[in-house]
Design a protein with these regions (language model features):
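Catalytic core of pol beta-like nucleotidyltransferases
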Residues: 1-25, 32-37, 47-104
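Short beta-strand->loop micro-motif that forms the acidic, two-metal-ion catalytic signature
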Residues: 42-46
Length: 104
């Protein structure tokens, strides 16, 4: 699927299913622009709460479902905004912050 069309569908899904105050980033090769046709879509979902519950990980499911329907692989990492800020020293955090595109 065309990149802009897929980003649009991800945004529409996010607006439909995510709680208020959430932030969704696209990162990795799709954000940097050095992707290939079989590259996956890496999403980082930040929820506006101090700590996640097991149920919060379910917010990633609609994006996986969108991937199945679109014949694309979508991987969603879920963190609370506080937990994400606590990872500021990690290479993963630094890579995401460098590459990210804010979707919502």
């Amino acid at each position: 699927m065309e990149r802009d069309m897929m980003i649009n569908q991800i945004k529409q899904t996010a607006v439909r299913v995510l709680p208020k105050g959430s932030t969704l980033y696209l990162y990795g090769s799709r954000a940097r622009g050095d992707y290939h046709s079989d590259s996956d879509w890496d999403l980082l979902l930040l929820l506006d709460k101090p700590k996640l519950t097991f149920k919060d990980y379910d917010y990633g499911y609609p994006f996986s479902e969108l991937g199945w329907e679109s014949n694309e692989e979508i991987n969603t990492q879920v963190y609370s905004k506080k937990e994400w800020a606590d990872y500021h020293f990690t290479p993963f955090y630094k890579n995401v912050e460098h590459d990210k595109i804010v979707l919502i």
